Regions:
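C-terminal boundary and immediately downstream tail of ABC-type ATPase nucleotide-binding domains
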Residues: 2, 247, 259-278
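ABC family nucleotide-binding domain
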Residues: 24-260, 266
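ABC-family P-loop ATPase nucleotide-binding domain
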Residues: 1-35
């Protein structure tokens, strides 16, 4: 399903459309006829959609509708059953060669996924490393950044997420919300072109959720990173998204501007889902 044309809508003063994505003609993310099966169970059923450069798109829908699977396919944490995924017009895991669908070699896939960062439900910080070491580990060992530069960058990111004073502490000394903010800084340290957010507040105590969402709002407002977001925080989705896609049964049943989806949904499944959670 292509990106929705929002026509002559007039976004409000705090609308994400104030920082609308650029459009150079090549989608940052493209799913073409994507199918994902686990055994006999089809999780994604012939999925087609694009995400433009700098666009922030939130995926909503009931559990089991395929939202997290989309993120995991982009990170190559799951194998694609059928179809193609493209990043900046380049194949992520498979390409057509002489009319045949051929899997790319692991080295090529690894190079492609360096463009993508992901923040998971569970923060999974290394317990034996300090906060700043958790953030510098990948830039030093994957990108080849020197340790001093990596530390300077990490401290800047910790400042951005409000945790600079925790730099030399271990994760066990931090609350769940603080650990998730470190995980966000860790993902940003790799300078991703695309940031995937998978229910990043679902494992947190309710009083810690706002701090994490405020950090993500700041990231959305201050960067041009393309973001694909899975969340049940509907106000957050409304605040930061350029588009919202509603999933059910591994298919997109509605795709539109946040105000359209949340105030005047057209699909009955969308209406039922939103009535249940709002």
């Amino acid at each position: 399903m292509p990106s929705t044309d929002h026509g002559d809508e007039r976004p409000g003063p705090h609308s994400p459309q104030d920082s609308a994505p650029s459009d150079d003609g090549t989608p940052t993310i493209e799913f073409r006829d994507v199918v994902k099966r686990f055994g006999d169970h089809t999780v994604l059923d012939g999925l087609n959609f694009t995400v433009g450069r700098g666009e922030r798109v939130t995926l909503i829908g009931p559990s089991g509708s395929g939202k997290t699977t989309i993120l995991r396919l982009l990170m190559t944490l799951e194998d694609l059953t059928e179809g193609f995924i493209l990043v900046d017009g380049e194949p992520l895991t498979h390409e057509l060669r002489n009319g045949r669908r051929v899997e790319l070699p692991p080295k090529r896939k690894k190079q492609m996924t360096r463009r993508i960062g992901m923040v998971f439900q569970q923060f999974n910080l290394f317990p034996n490393m300090t906060v700043v070491q958790n953030i510098t580990e990948a830039p030093v060992n994957v990108l080849g950044m020197d340790k001093a530069s990596a530390r300077d960058k990490a401290l800047g990111l910790l400042r951005q997420v409000g945790l600079e004073e925790k730099a030399d502490q271990h994760p066990s000394r931090l609350s769940g919300g603080q650990q998730q903010r470190v995980a966000i800084a860790r993902a940003l340290a790799m300078d991703p072109e695309i940031l995937l957010l998978d229910e990043v507040t679902s494992a947190l105590d309710p009083e810690l959720v706002d701090d994490v969402l405020n950090v993500l709002r700041d990231v959305a407002e201050s960067t041009d990173i393309t973001m694909l977001i899975v969340t049940h925080e509907m106000q957050f989705a409304r605040d930061v998204s350029h588009r919202v896609m509603m999933f059910d049964g591994g298919r997109i049943v509605e795709d539109g501007h946040p105000e359209e989806i949340f105030t005047d949904p057209k699909n009955e499944r969308t209406k039922t889902f939103l009535r249940a959670i709002l």
